[in-house]
Amino acid sequence: MFGRKQSPQKSVKNGQGNAPSVYDEALNWEAAHVRLVEKSERRAWKIAGAFGTITVLLGIGIAGMLPLKQHVPYLVRVNAQTGAPDILTSLDEKSVSYDTVMDKYWLSQYVIARETYDWYTLQKDYETVGMLSSPSEGQSYASQFQGDKALDKQYGSNVRTSVTIVSIVPNGKGIGTVRFAKTTKRTNETGDGETTHWIATIGYQYVNPSLMSESARLTNPLGFNVTSYRVDPEMGVVQ
């Protein structure tokens, strides 16, 4: 009897065959996906690291530039004769106090106004010295312009005396020492004139500016007031 032939079974190949199974394909896809994710994460970390490095470098650069943006105050002196500004020194809050700076300023202004003789600015200097002086010291200064031998009558517009401040040392106790040079020459001369060197010892104080007139406060807003003034030739300097 011929029996029914059995139909051949389609073989399904596994990992040991030539064709991959559905299971193997799934494993391969998952492994490839994992590698792709790991590669993407490594790339992201590299980019983040690069940005972090750039941020640190920018911070260092900005910190290095901060000293360049620092505002350093300077004491500027304006020449009373020419109006030219002159930077004397930088001011360090740790080494130079505000009171010292102001004392030096007013002491220099006083000596310049009192020792300068210029026919064309004489009235202004005269008024400035009066406003910055006590009554007795102001009278002592004014006396040189009184009588037949008054300084303005002797010099007129023919002589000019200019002042150069050499150094100022306030001791913080109401006494200051100012070293200065005076150059005197006739206005019709072309030479350098005669220069002499002096030391002024000045007693001073600050009075309440509210007790002063408005015009005086415009010239002397802090109430600087000279109570004594003595000038001596500087020893050891060729006059």
UniProtKB/Swiss-Prot annotation:
Which gene codes for it? virB8
SUPFAM superfamilies, A to Z: NTF2-like
Location(s), subcellular: Cell inner membrane
Query: Which family does this protein fall into?
Result: Belongs to the virB8 family.
Quick one: where is this thing mainly located? membrane
Q: What else is known?
A: Transcription of the operon is maximal in early exponential phase.
Q: Which GO terms describe its molecular function?
A: identical protein binding
The identity of this protein, by name, is: Type IV secretion system protein virB8
Q: Identify one Gene Ontology CC term for this UniProt entry.
A: plasma membrane
Q: Which organism is it from?
A: Brucella suis biovar 1 (strain 1330)
* Membrane topology of this protein: Single-pass membrane protein
Q: Which UniProt keywords apply?
A: Cell inner membrane, Cell membrane, Membrane, Transmembrane, Transmembrane helix, Virulence
What this chain does, per the record? The VirB system could be required for the establishment of the replication niche in the host.
Pfam families named in the record: VirB8 (PF04335)
Give GO terms for biological process. Answer: protein secretion by the type IV secretion system
Query: The organism sits in which domain of life?
Result: Bacteria
